[in-house]
Every structure is written in C-alpha cells, then in structure tokens.
Amino acid sequence: MNNVFVYCEIEGTTVADVSLELLTKGRKLANQLGCQLEAIAAGTGLAGIEKQVLPYGVDKLHVFNAPGLFPYTSLPHTSILVNLFKEEKPQICLMGATVIGRDLGPRVSSALTSGLTADCTQLEIGTHEDKKNGITYENLLYQIRPAFGGNIVATIVNPECRPQMATVREGVMKKEIYDPAYKGEVVKLDPKKYVSDTDFVVEVIDRQMEKSKANVKGASIIVAGGYGMGSKENFDM
C-alpha cells in the first residue's frame, strides 16, 4: 500500500533498459518516502525474471506470466495495471516514455482518474503549497519536463489523485544495480483474475523489427552536424 511502482517493459524475456533506469530512480524515491519499491512484469516465459529485477532494490515483484501477454497489446496490460492498482493503491507509478508507455500510461490514468505527466526528464520529491486554499502537501512527486517547445522547464504536481503517474524518457536516468544480492519478494499472480477473455481480442500474427545500426544512447560522445558539413568525409577529425 502507498508504495512506488514501476511497470517493466519486456522484449521477449529481457527487461528494457528504460525500465531498469526507472527502477534505479524508483529505489531512490522510495528511500526518500520511506516506503517500498514494487515492480510489475507481464509477459510470456518469464521464469527467472526476478534475477533481472530484484538487484535494483525491488522489494516486491508482481509477475503475470501467461500466453498472450507478449507481444504487448493494449487491453490485457491495461486491465492488469488497473485491477492491480485498485488492490495495491500505489502512490507513484513510473513507466518508460516509449511506444508502449505512451499507449499504456494514458489508458491506466484515465481508468483510475489520476494525473499523468508524459515525457519527464527529471523526478524529485518535494512540498507543494496551495495558496488559494491554504493547504500544504508534503512528499509529492515533482514531475519535471520541457514545455512550450522546450523553451521552459515545467514542474508538475498531482496533489489529490493517486497514483501520481509519469512516463520518463529513455536514457535520462542512470541505470545502477542497488545490491546484487538484494532479497525481494516475488509474487506470481494469476492473469485470469485480472484480465478477461475479451481483452485478448487483438492477436499479433507477425512482427517485423529492424535492428538499430548504432547505439546512440550508449555512446559517450556524439558528433552531429547538418547539411553544412557537405559530406561524411568532412566529419573526419
């Protein structure tokens, strides 16, 4: 109850880097708030998935392992999060600002009538004073993101509704293992109790994925130029 939750995106049986980055940040937020960090993994063939997740300081991992949960489709994953959150009542939920996160986040937020800030670049814990009503809110999630075309940086808070939800851009948080031997609880849940048969109305027949030619996110130095460079030879240094 009232913990920090991270939705883990899974490609096959591998947790996405953006989710591991959010687990790192989620652990820090949970330490500040004095609560637990919990994670959600939903997919197919997830035996041993806790080995990837628990070292990031996860106190409880909720595992939904069943055919039809991978590849990702909207309705089953939405039902899982909405129904789980009604039970667990988290105060914060984080997910990646990816194709999946941008689809899933608004669906869950709308179903729970909670606030969602998209494409955050920074997350902090702080106090908010509602001067109009004379109310001070403690330990709110500061959801920080560029606004108005990147001309300003906005800090957004959600004082009333829970969970406070945010999607976070990949690569802006640092991925760090908290404790390689961290002992967390693994809870294996029955997806049938959270997802109805009608949620599986969409079936993925085939997927065509193009591999990235260069790992820009993992580069320590990036050299960029426009049309003025003339040719690729002019990039030689």
Which role fits each region the language model picked out?
Residues 1-237:
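N-terminal glycine-rich FAD/FM-binding segment characteristic of electron-transfer flavoproteins
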